[in-house]
Each structure stands twice: as structure tokens, then as C-alpha cells.
């Protein structure tokens, strides 16, 4: 009969600690070997012009590792945390290497003293780029900045972008690049192209994130072609060197997607916040009852209403595709409101099932993503 763990005599604690220390040392050696391989990967990517971040590969690798952990009886959350930290360290090492190899351009940021413009100025400066930022009460004039830099970035409110582009566009020198970081693309791109000479290239960009973090790690940036190919390729490579995942699109597709991604989502959040305000709901008390989903939703509502009203007003009103989608939103909200008012359970079930059928191929990914978000929220309290 085999000896069970309960009947086995206890081992000496100092011996156990010695063995643990030995295993920890082995782990450190493995980590050092892994980081050396990461540097080799970075050198290869620099030579081939590849981005530092590959979302699909990273996700597939983590799934494989989690399955192997499960097969060995290891807790998935611990393994996920360990490899998430390792992947983050690996990406940072790759980005730093790629940034040292990147061509250093003179960058002028119009509107570079606050918000996203200030964030980008800081990111580029820390990697050795010469950056000139100007704001309403700081620095040289926008025209002077435009005339003396290789890359000129427009980081101004949506409502001002077209006017600023028309004002500074004629000042750019031949061979330079004018780009924006606005959340609509058709009107800004048209204004940048119309206001600049044929010798100036134009690129439309839209970082799909806010001014936080140390750079663009794992963040998406949409690129839209304006005029020319040279600077388009350079800007794409530059974003990728700082860890961004670049999505290429036409200005028309970008604006239609933003009507869904930004207008619909932000309008929904505004409506929810407005309802809570009309109810004068006790938010602190509601959190004592809250499910993780409600806590997430309330956090997003609070986040939006802690920012500038003008930004969201511009997002909702400047996109030419917004009116049609907002009308559809109103129709669907009205459909459910009528069903609730009439206690029409069948109508709710019918529409729910129609949407579920539309989303069935998307459901597996959605459950996986939302589960990860909710688990992390519960862990963090």
C-alpha cells in the first residue's frame, strides 16, 4: 500500500526552503534566457520592418499556455498573470530596441500642450525625437511650427481641425508631412490635402485610446491615406515601433465605423447617465447591491462625465454618419420601451433571439473577453 501524504513524515522546513530557492533560481535563469531570445526577435523585427506587437499570436500563445496549465492542475489565473507580465516585459524590451533603431524626425505638434497632443509629445521626446509643441498660450505660432518641422501633427478639437488645417497647411515645406489625430477623417483629410502643396504628404491617423500609459503598447491606431506613400509608410512604422496595432482604412470606412464604435456607444452612455441624473439615484448605495456588470457600466458612465462635454458633443455631432445611426438607436430603444410599458414579454424574447442569432458566431469571443474583464474587476474590488 502506498504511503499517503498525510502519513508521510513532515520534511524539514529549511530543506524545503532550500529546494524552493533552487527552483526560483532556475526560474530566473529561464527568464534571462527568454529575454535574450526576445532581443533576437526584436533585431529580426527591426531588420524586416515588422511591428513589435502581434495581437493574434499573443492571444493564441496564451490560450495554449493556459490549456497546458490546466492539464497540469495549475490555477489558470496565476498562470495568466505570470505570462501577461512576461509578455508585457517582452513587448517593452522590443519597443525600446525598435525605438533606438527608428529614424528620428523633427516633430511639431499643434495643440501639443494638453491631452493627447501632450501625451504624444512626451512619448516621442523620451525616445530621442526633437519635438516642438505649441498651445494657445505656449510656444511659437501654429504657422511657425508648421513651417519648421518634418512631421506636423494637428491635435486640436474636432470643431477646429479643418480651420487649423487650412491655416497652417500652406506653411509646410516641401517634403514634409501633415497629419492629424482627429476622430473623424473625411473633412480633416480633405482640408489637409486642399491646403497643402503637392510636395507635402498627408496622412490621417486616429489613435483609438486616451492619453495614458508610457507609449502606445497594445493600442489600436487607424491610418487613412491622404497624399503620398513615403510618409504613410514612415508613420505606420513609427506607430508600430511604439507598440501600436495599426488598422488601415479609407476615410469613409473609418467614419462609418466610428459612428458605430463611438457615436452609438457614447450616446448610449450619455442616455444612461442622464437617466441616473433624472432619478437622482444614490450611486454609492447602488454599488452596495451591484453586480460586476453594473459596476463596469457605472464606471464607464462616471468616466465619460468626468471629461470635457465639448469632446463628446463633437464626436456625436461632427460625424456625417451619426444621424442615421442615432435614429436607429432611438427606434430600437422605443421598441423595447413599448414592450416594457405593455408587459409584452414575447416581444422582448423575439427581438432578443433575433439579435442572438445575428451574434452567434461572435458569442464565444464575447464571452471570453467579458469573462476576463469581469474576473479582473472582481479581483480588484
Task: Kindly give the residue locations of the regions a language model identified.
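Rossmann-fold NAD(P) dinucleotide-binding segment
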Residues: 143-195
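Active-site-proximal catalytic alpha-helix in oxidoreductases
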Residues: 219, 254-283, 287-306
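Rossmann-fold dinucleotide-binding core
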Residues: 185, 192-245, 249-251, 255-258
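Extended, charge-rich alpha-helical interface modules
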Residues: 2-105, 122, 126
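Adenosine-cofactor binding site in Rossmann-like domains, unifying the SAM/SAH pocket
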Residues: 131-144
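Hydrophobic/small residue at the entry helix of a nucleotide-binding pocket
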Residues: 115-116
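Interdomain hinge/lid region at the active-site interface
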Residues: 287-362
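Conserved N-terminal Rossmann-fold NAD(P)-binding element of oxidoreductases
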Residues: 108-112
